[in-house]
Amino acid sequence: ILGVINLNIDGLLKLNGAQKLIELEGNISWFYCSKCGMDKDTNLIIQNKDEFACNSCHKNILKPSIPFVGQEFSQWDMKDSWMMLNSCDNLIIFADNFLSPVTISFIDIVEKRMKNTKIICSESLNSDIFDFSSNNIDFIYESSDLFLDSLIEAFGDNII
């Protein structure tokens, strides 16, 4: 496993010890000041009932480390994602009921290299709406939990 590109902001993969993790949309486990860069753990804010004002520069409100509507992903995380995608032999995507534009762009990167993509989803995605020209893309309609159990059984601790 080269790594995991995560598009969730819950931070659960990191909390559970995932290695080689790129949290493309950030996570809500820490807040930061966009003026001076000071950061603070979310748990400290909750436990101490701290204000969201920056304790360092006193000029800004702390915000979670996630992109908001209209903001781009961090460029270094995008670069790391592209490097990982350009090195992988297989791309496995766990999807709910849709594929985001960034996910589709990741599939395109892997598809151009003639590598395999498996899209695991418990609900039926309308694969006809996607313009995937390759036969290297498979939709697997199974729960993510069952598929993960199969991966863990096959690869053990090498998954994370």
Regions of interest found by a model, annotated:
Residues 1-160:
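Conserved catalytic alpha/beta core of Sir2/sirtuin-type deacylases, generalized to analogous enzyme cores
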